[in-house]
Amino acid sequence: MKVRNILFLVLASLLLCTAVSAAEYTDVSDTHWAYKQIDYLSAEITGYPDGSYKPEKSVSRAEFLTLFARIAFPDEWKRVEGEEWWKSAYEVCTAHDLLNNITGSRSEAMPRGEIAALLERFCSGWGGVHERADAAEQYVINWKEQRMEFPEWQPLFSDAAEYWSSVLISANQGLLTGYPDGSFKPGKGVTRAEAAAILARLKAQLVLREKKGCEYVCTVGEYWLMQYADSGSVGLALYEPLTGKLVQTVGLWKAAQGVSGYAAFDRLLSGSDGIYVWGRTGLYKRSGNTLEQIVAEPVLDFCWYDDNTLYYLSWDDTKQIPAYYCSAAYFPCASSVMKLENPGQNAVRTILAERDESSPMQNLTDIYVEYGTLYAAGSYCMGIGDLHAALYEVKDGKLTALFGEY
């Protein structure tokens, strides 16, 4: 056991040697999938005396936490000569209350579930938009019992129920990904290449947050869609992750009078589902590494009837946003049901119905097309845990209540 521990200390200490670029490693070619990430972390992570990087070697808890601390807390992490090489990282992470769920041996491989828990705590309060804000979160119409229901909870990955909150946050922040079979493998360790990829994404987001005031929203092809604030306005732009290079300015929204800057920033987008991105600056479709705008006005929810007909919920943010008890904490509520035919240069936009300002239930949140009929859901919160939802048929310029309204 002593020999094993000594070997662990020797190998791990190599992480803290003089930095070199990825091009100098004998076993990391410029075609390696993690080449750019390893090179990006040349100041934080190093190789071995024989000139190798060993990208497939497993990373221990102490190694991962040391690299994490150097990136997340560069002004606090400090290696003291004569002390164990991992001690400063553990002290810094403990001071920031990041190690509550990390209790295993320092020399053992750090599992992905623990990495997710670490990143969840560190990223708490960051203002990105969850990828899960999609159709899976809509109210479900229960026609038989004539009521609206919350959707059945679906985990982001098939095997991560124990870490669902940690995995959701770290994945939605673009830091961790799952496997093609839908699993996350929370008990699996990470290799040096995988650790470099995870921590390179973290470092790049920290740089964009600090230098440009950006918040990660989602990934579009090879780029990151970021939110940024600028002189009372909030915008969207695509950035190249590791270089921070601006690729495409997507949209700009100026906060209406009376809407706080934080609220405007937090709610710039309503959702992203892997194909579309939507919110205050409109509706966009992912197309390779770019976003193509379909609707220029605010979009809270949408559905396609066919290839040329789009229905969506919109609102006028120059008016007072419906302020039922719960909505201010989540998404704004739409006030108009819209139809867009022939999206593109010859698009025809029609207002199908508008919210009845006297009805507290008509805070529109979801839109549906079933068997050729258009419906919209509205909700109202009477208090904590007391949420009511109603279903309306959109017909003849009106919202006709079918059930749930009181």
Task: Describe the predicted segments one by one.
Residues 212-219, 257-270, 297-307, 360-370, ...:
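Repeated scaffold domains used in trafficking and secretory/extracellular systems
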Residues 229-233, 282-284, 316-321, 330-331, ...:
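Short glycine/acidic-enriched loop and turn motifs that connect beta-strands
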Residues 18-215:
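N-terminal propeptides
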Residues 9-18:
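Bacterial N-terminal signal peptides
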Residues 1-7:
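Bacterial N-terminal signal peptides that target proteins for export
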